[in-house]
């Protein structure tokens, strides 16, 4: 996993994303190199000026040379520094965009179990926040590291040429600086991981408060949510201060060792000057180069914190990119299925649960037949619906479509033959037309979309809207009523025209008028399709070809509505209870 990768391995992997932009990357490095290598030219000019300029300047051009040379140096630094920064930023922003795309592409292909086991807020935080951390390491931090490192190398080369003895004294403090940086790097990386987890919790609390704002208001949960949010941001603040403490402590220590080296050097240089072992120009040039060395050295040590944050973020990013996608080892293509669905001794247990949600359940849905699953909460109805499209893998038994075992069928081929309409309608912040013609049907014609909407009894309210099919419906269809949202979901399923249909309590949350429209749309949708209905309101499935009653994951009884009432078992008891409740209301 990515948490086991070293810093070098993480950087090398990041560089694989840089490969498509290698020309711009090399150009950025070249520009930074020119800008950085202009650094030692300034102290070199200072040496020449002090040793030769004042005493040997006779002609008019001698007086202009040094001012023009200094202006030229800083002009070169400015131009090439700008080009280097811009090109490196262009490369890094493209890399970040590709990383986000890679994360999103992997996310939409993750197995359903991953979403059950991981907080959605943390997943959102990884794509939004963690990639930004990589951007910080890839832009500002990386730019500073490259540019300042080249400046340090250039100045050290000049110092070695000028006085190698003094330079060796300078380098003697490097091991101490390296130890400080190494110790603090581990600390900063650890804290950065904690900050990422903390940001995920903040995002989760925000998401729940926003999505559940009506519940928060009705039940007076404002203070409770404020406390939850305060706890999450307090943890983030605590971790931020730990990171600041490590970063702030590192910089003075590095500067102390560097200043100690400078102090020793100045003492030795003064002794050499007193014995005529060095010139004034050489001494001033050496001290100037030493002082110029301090700024890039400080920036290089300061950049350690964002680099460690970036590496911790890269670990998080690659851990998502490396997650295994849904297993899809099937080779068989269904084409358009006839619609024969068979559950044969199916057993499934949710992770962390001791009792199977389904235990040795067998059932058959013949082509064009409507089979309803009923039972109390927790009986396994929705689990059966989730297993047919292979949202989860079975523990035991087998599910077949047209005689083909699910693991042998290509995942896309299987799901192309299944449409789903559930109680929890999912709509996207797009137009009505785009929500009907979603996914594989996005190239549907206007006539096909209108025909699907008409069959779903949705065209009447759509045409009443000023912009019709082009109406934006807001997040999850917030601008529409429950019945309207449900009919759009049915229109989407009608347009898909899949031979197998799953209805998961599709009318349980609707009022009577909305249910009448939706039930009419469902009747249109179910015609000629193999339909598996998960029902809570038993009155909606009286016309089903067969009804299967489940309890505690076991099949209790099977038959038509009339047969099960005559049997006077579980279904009959549930039916009488609901009828009594309806009369009481």
UniProtKB/Swiss-Prot annotation:
<keyword id="KW-1278">Translocase</keyword>
<feature type="transmembrane region" description="Helical">
    <location>
        <begin position="127"/>
        <end position="146"/>
    </location>
</feature>
<dbReference type="GO" id="GO:0016887">
    <property type="term" value="F:ATP hydrolysis activity"/>
</dbReference>
<feature type="transmembrane region" description="Helical">
    <location>
        <begin position="25"/>
        <end position="45"/>
    </location>
</feature>
<dbReference type="InterPro" id="IPR027417">
    <property type="entry name" value="P-loop_NTPase"/>
</dbReference>
<feature type="transmembrane region" description="Helical">
    <location>
        <begin position="150"/>
        <end position="170"/>
    </location>
</feature>
<keyword id="KW-0067">ATP-binding</keyword>
<dbReference type="InterPro" id="IPR011917">
    <property type="entry name" value="ABC_transpr_lipidA"/>
</dbReference>
<dbReference type="InterPro" id="IPR036640">
    <property type="entry name" value="ABC1_TM_sf"/>
</dbReference>
<comment type="subunit">
    <text>Homodimer.</text>
</comment>
<dbReference type="InterPro" id="IPR017871">
    <property type="entry name" value="ABC_transporter-like_CS"/>
</dbReference>
<dbReference type="GO" id="GO:0015421">
    <property type="term" value="F:ABC-type oligopeptide transporter activity"/>
</dbReference>
<keyword id="KW-0813">Transport</keyword>
<feature type="transmembrane region" description="Helical">
    <location>
        <begin position="63"/>
        <end position="83"/>
    </location>
</feature>
<comment type="function">
    <text>Involved in lipopolysaccharide (LPS) biosynthesis. Translocates lipid A-core from the inner to the outer leaflet of the inner membrane. Transmembrane domains (TMD) form a pore in the inner membrane and the ATP-binding domain (NBD) is responsible for energy generation.</text>
</comment>
<keyword id="KW-0812">Transmembrane</keyword>
<feature type="transmembrane region" description="Helical">
    <location>
        <begin position="277"/>
        <end position="297"/>
    </location>
</feature>
<dbReference type="GO" id="GO:0005524">
    <property type="term" value="F:ATP binding"/>
</dbReference>
<keyword id="KW-0472">Membrane</keyword>
<keyword id="KW-0547">Nucleotide-binding</keyword>
<dbReference type="Pfam" id="PF00005">
    <property type="entry name" value="ABC_tran"/>
</dbReference>
<dbReference type="InterPro" id="IPR003439">
    <property type="entry name" value="ABC_transporter-like_ATP-bd"/>
</dbReference>
<comment type="similarity">
    <text>Belongs to the ABC transporter superfamily. Lipid exporter (TC 3.A.1.106) family.</text>
</comment>
<dbReference type="InterPro" id="IPR011527">
    <property type="entry name" value="ABC1_TM_dom"/>
</dbReference>
<keyword id="KW-1133">Transmembrane helix</keyword>
<dbReference type="InterPro" id="IPR039421">
    <property type="entry name" value="Type_1_exporter"/>
</dbReference>
<dbReference type="InterPro" id="IPR003593">
    <property type="entry name" value="AAA+_ATPase"/>
</dbReference>
<dbReference type="GO" id="GO:0005886">
    <property type="term" value="C:plasma membrane"/>
</dbReference>
<feature type="transmembrane region" description="Helical">
    <location>
        <begin position="250"/>
        <end position="270"/>
    </location>
</feature>
<feature type="domain" description="ABC transporter">
    <location>
        <begin position="341"/>
        <end position="577"/>
    </location>
</feature>
<protein>
    <recommendedName>
        <fullName>ATP-dependent lipid A-core flippase</fullName>
        <ecNumber>7.5.2.6</ecNumber>
    </recommendedName>
</protein>
<feature type="binding site">
    <location>
        <begin position="375"/>
        <end position="382"/>
    </location>
    <ligand>
        <name>ATP</name>
    </ligand>
</feature>
<feature type="domain" description="ABC transmembrane type-1">
    <location>
        <begin position="26"/>
        <end position="309"/>
    </location>
</feature>
<dbReference type="Pfam" id="PF00664">
    <property type="entry name" value="ABC_membrane"/>
</dbReference>
<dbReference type="GO" id="GO:0034040">
    <property type="term" value="F:ATPase-coupled lipid transmembrane transporter activity"/>
</dbReference>
<keyword id="KW-0997">Cell inner membrane</keyword>
<keyword id="KW-1003">Cell membrane</keyword>
<keyword id="KW-0445">Lipid transport</keyword>
């Amino acid at each position: 996993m990515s948490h086991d990768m070293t810093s070098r391995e993480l950087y090398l992997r990041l560089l694989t994303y840089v490969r498509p932009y290698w020309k711009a990357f090399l150009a950025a490095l070249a520009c930074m190199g020119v800008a950085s290598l202009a650094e030692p030219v300034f102290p070199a000019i200072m040496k020449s000026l002090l040793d030769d300029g004042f005493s040997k300047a006779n002609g008019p051009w001698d007086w202009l040379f040094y001012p023009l040379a200094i202006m030229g140096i800083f002009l070169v630094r400015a131009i090439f520094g700008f080009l280097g920064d811009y090109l490196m930023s262009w490369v890094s922003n493209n890399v970040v965009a590709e990383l986000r795309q890679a994360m999103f592409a992997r996310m939409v292909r993750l197995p359903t179990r991953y979403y059950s086991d991981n907080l959605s807020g943390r997943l959102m935080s990884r794509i939004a926040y963690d990639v930004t951390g990589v951007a910080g390491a890839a832009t500002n931090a990386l730019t500073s590291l490259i540019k300042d490192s080249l400046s340090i190398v250039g100045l050290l080369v000049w110092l070695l040429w000028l006085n190698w003895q003094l330079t060796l004294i300078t380098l003697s403090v490097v091991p101490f600086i390296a130890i400080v940086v190494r110790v603090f790097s581990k600390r900063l990386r650890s804290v950065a991981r904690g900050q990422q987890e903390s940001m995920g919790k903040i995002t989760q609390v925000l998401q729940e408060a926003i999505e559940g704002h009506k519940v928060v208001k009705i039940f007076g949960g404002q203070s409770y949510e404020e406390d939850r949010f305060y706890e999450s941001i307090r943890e983030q603040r605590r971790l931020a201060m730990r990171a600041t403490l490590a970063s702030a402590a590192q910089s003075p220590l590095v500067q102390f060792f560097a200043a100690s080296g400078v102090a020793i050097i100045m003492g030795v240089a003064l002794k050499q000057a007193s014995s005529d072992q060095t010139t004034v120009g050489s001494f001033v040039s050496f001290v100037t180069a030493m002082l110029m060395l301090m700024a890039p050295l400080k920036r290089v040590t300061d950049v350690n914190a964002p680099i460690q944050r970036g590496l911790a973020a890269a670990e998080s990013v690659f851990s998502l990119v490396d997650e295994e996608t849904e297993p899809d080892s099937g080779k068989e293509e269904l084409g358009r299925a006839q619609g024969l669905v068979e559950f044969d001794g199916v057993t499934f247990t949710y992770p962390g649960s001791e009792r199977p949600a389904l235990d040795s359940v067998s059932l058959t849905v013949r082509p064009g037949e409507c089979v309803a699953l009923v039972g109390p909460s927790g009986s396994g109805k929705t689990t059966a619906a989730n297993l047919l499209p292979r949202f989860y893998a079975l523990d035991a038994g087998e599910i077949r479509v047209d005689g083909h075992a699910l693991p042998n069928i290509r995942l896309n081929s299987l799901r192309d033959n299944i449409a789903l309409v559930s109680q929890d309608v999912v709509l996207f912040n797009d137009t009505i037309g785009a929500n009907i013609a979603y996914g594989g049907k996005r190239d549907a014609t206007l006539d096909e979309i209108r025909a699907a909407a008409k069959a779903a009894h949705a065209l009447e309210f759509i045409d009443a809207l000023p912009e019709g099919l082009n109406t934006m419906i807001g997040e999850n269809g917030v601008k529409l009523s429950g019945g309207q949202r449900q009919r759009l979901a049915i229109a989407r399923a009608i347009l898909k025209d899949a031979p197998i249909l799953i209805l998961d309590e599709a009318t349980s949350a609707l009022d009577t008028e909305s249910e009448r429209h939706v039930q009419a749309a469902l009747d249109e949708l179910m015609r000629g399709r193999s339909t598996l209905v998960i029902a809570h309101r038993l009155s909606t499935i009286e016309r089903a070809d067969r009804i299967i009653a489940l309890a505690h994951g076991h099949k209790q009884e099977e038959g038509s509505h009339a047969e099960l009432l005559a049997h006077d078992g579980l279904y009959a008891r549930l039916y009488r209870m609901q009828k009594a409740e309806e009369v009481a209301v």
